[in-house]
A protein has these predicted regions:
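Mid-chain, structured segments of secreted extracytoplasmic proteins
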Residues: 70-101
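Long, compositionally biased charged/polar accessory segments in the mid-to-C-terminal portions
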Residues: 167-223
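Short, flexible, mixed-charge glycine/proline-rich loop motifs
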Residues: 37-39, 43-45, 83-86, 93-95, ...
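N-terminal secretory signal peptides and thylakoid transit peptides that target proteins
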Residues: 1-16
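Iron-sulfur cluster-binding cysteine motifs and their immediate structural context
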Residues: 24-29, 51-73, 97-124, 130-147, ...
Length: 223
């Protein structure tokens, strides 16, 4: 059973943009029912076209020189002429136990209780880079214009607020990305996690990442 547009819009609720209020306070103004968003990247379907990267940059107005999302191509796997490449998504994992949140001295880095999305309040960020140093996935950066920490937010303040799926999900031509509510057993993402083997990167660190991956069938899975 797939997640209908009505269910998705209900889950999105009133995802409001952060505007001069502490992240922990803003979280209380969002959908009171609460959801826990996650994503699956199917490495067996990803062709490395980088359409997701282009869509992310355009929708979220990410300047050149930095990126919220990167697709990394592996070394060739297999023997000629049967050569394959594995494509690995590098982006925020939206951890339930996010080190970046724990080290932030101003509360600018926060996990939204209503959606499970880890985000940054630019009005509180002082650019100290503690969160960048603490993130074991190396997916945060200082925005060259705002001089504050930035990263993937699942398009929380753009597409999600408008009732759409994240830009990367909408742009993927092979449907390698699935997004939805992990706490809804009937959602498309929950059904997928029941049907396919998945792994999570650096799971042993105890961060409880919410970016799942269907492994590429050649070679070993990176942990």
């Amino acid at each position: 059973m797939t997640w209908s547009r009505r269910q998705f819009l209900t889950g999105v609720g009133v995802l409001a943009a952060v505007s001069g209020t502490a992240g922990r306070v803003v979280a209380k103004t969002l959908n009171i029912n609460g959801v826990r968003y996650g994503m699956v990247h199917d490495e067996s379907l990803c062709i490395g076209c980088t359409a997701c990267m282009d869509a992310c940059r355009k929708v979220n107005k990410v300047p050149e020189g930095v990126s919220r999302l990167t697709i990394i191509r592996s070394e060739p796997q297999g023997e000629f002429p049967d050569v394959k490449y594995r494509f690995f998504r590098k982006s925020c994992q939206h951890c339930d136990r996010a080190p970046c949140v724990d080290v932030c001295p101003t509360g600018a880095s926060f996990r939204d209780a209503a959606s499970g999305i880890v985000d940054v309040n630019p009005d509180l960020c002082v650019g100290c880079q503690y969160c960048i140093a603490a993130c074991p996935y190396r997916v945060r950066f200082i925005h060259p214009v705002t001089k504050t920490a930035d990263k993937c937010d699942f398009c929380r303040k753009t597409h999600l607020q408008a009732g759409k799926l994240p830009a990367c999900v909408e742009a993927c031509p092979t449907k390698a990305l699935t997004f939805g509510n992990l706490d809804d057993p009937n959602s498309e993402i929950s059904q997928l996690l029941c049907q396919k083997p998945t792994y999570r990167y650096k799971l042993a660190l105890g961060t409880k990442p919410k970016l799942y991956r269907v492994p590429f069938k050649y070679g070993e899975v990176s942990q």
